Amino acid sequence: KPTKPNSHHFFNIKNKSIFTHIKLNIYPDGGVARIRIYGNMKINKQFGKKVINLTSVLNGASPIACNNEHFGRAENILAPGVGKNMGDGWETRRSRGKNFDWLILKCATAGKINKIQIDTHHFKGNYPDKCSLQAAYLNGKISAKSIVNKSKNWKLLLSKVKLHAHKKHNFKNKLMKNKKVNYIKINI
């Protein structure tokens, strides 16, 4: 479709097919600053019984909602590998009241949690003192607002634990060992 210089262009696509690759052709030539393709991931059933990172963006996990993204985007914690710096993680401005900061993630696929890793790499003076995790298995299409409201009553996946600066914290799932989950709430 024809476009104009120095502007954003949005195109609605009605194709329901599943794609793994997109090719952008520009005619006759020129430059494109950014391309963003929005859509929903189709979960690959090849995982089967294989142990995978249920909260990896590469496997299809996504952030649903959070209460604060003052210094870093919540979606950053889903990225693969080790963070480059603090800006490459999720950082809040810290709640000073009795409430805590939280983030809700939709898992790549429903699964049973074996182990949990909370990484505070690069966070030396501003790591969360404690954290807890809640989880649930929710069926059907549910709005983000409804998920946030329901999350207040989710079961504990990890009881409140002390965290430390610049460290990978590893935990075994003892509270919901044989329960299937597809949403996780991080409380810090």
Task: Please provide the spans of the model-predicted regions.
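Trp- and acidic/polar-enriched beta-sheet ligand-binding modules for extracellular glycan
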Residues: 1-102, 112, 122-188
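A short glycine/threonine-centered beta-strand motif
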Residues: 107-109
